[in-house]
Amino acid sequence: MRRPCSLLLSGLFALFAIAGGCQRLPPLTAIVAGGTGPPTLVLLHGYGSSAERWAPFTQTIRWPAPARFVFPQGPDAMVRTDDAADGRAWWPLDLTSYRQAGKGAPDLSSARPPGLKRAASQVENLLDDRRIVPRGPVVLGGYSQGAMVASEVAFRSRVPLSALVVLSGTLVDEQSWESHFGERRGLPVFLAHGRQDSTLPFEAADRMRRKLEAAGLQVTWCPFDGGHDMPTAVVIALNDFLARLHL
């Protein structure tokens, strides 16, 4: 039996802590904003960022009431990056050492990060908690490392989803993911990536796009001139994508 969630109110936001369910995983926290839902947009931050930094994103999304926005917090705290000493992660990475080795953008398509399954399971538990994610249409998405977790949930679980949003993500465990693409046939997917991304390769995102389309998913592809970022053009395209869902 799950423990009751704890609820802390702060302005327009509510902070929930949920139990890890039968898998005995540590609890996630999530900032919840907007209306009571549905529909609900669940957006996972990237490596070294946090739910608090992503919560203002609601101001750029034109989704009418009673839409709800949920920003889960990565379980690993105090991740030190070049520009943030208080960030969080979905699993530990050593990007600094990788960059110093001069290897450029890593190809993770054949990798199976040891913390990916845990993070995905925690997100699945959150999606199953009706106090946080009400029954009804759910759009799951993420940026960078968060996009990998969102994709893992989409392609390795049976969680009901109305759409998937992949912002500057990449292919991970490609062979396994691809074997499940067909199970999400018809799913709308928003996929955005910078052509000059030096953190996660553009080529891997483009390959993911082609394979998703071949499997019958409805991909909205938004390549842009830029690096590991989310420019205004992507936000505009994402708003158009969400509007076309008619949720």
Language-model-detected regions and their locations in the chain:
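Bacterial N-terminal signal peptides that target proteins for export
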Residues: 1-9
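Bacterial Sec-dependent signal peptides at the C-terminal "C-region" and cleavage site
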Residues: 13-26
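Serine-hydrolase catalytic machinery in alpha/beta-hydrolase-like enzymes
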Residues: 24-135
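Conserved alpha/beta-hydrolase "nucleophile elbow" surrounding the catalytic nucleophile
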Residues: 45-47, 138-143, 194
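Residue in the alpha/beta-hydrolase core beta-strand immediately N-terminal to the catalytic nucleophile
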Residues: 139, 163-165
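Gly/Ala-rich beta-loop-alpha elbow adjacent to hydrolase catalytic centers
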Residues: 142-146, 150
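Conserved hydrolase catalytic core segment
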Residues: 152-163
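The feature captures the conserved acid-bearing segment of alpha/beta-hydrolase catalytic domains
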Residues: 166-244
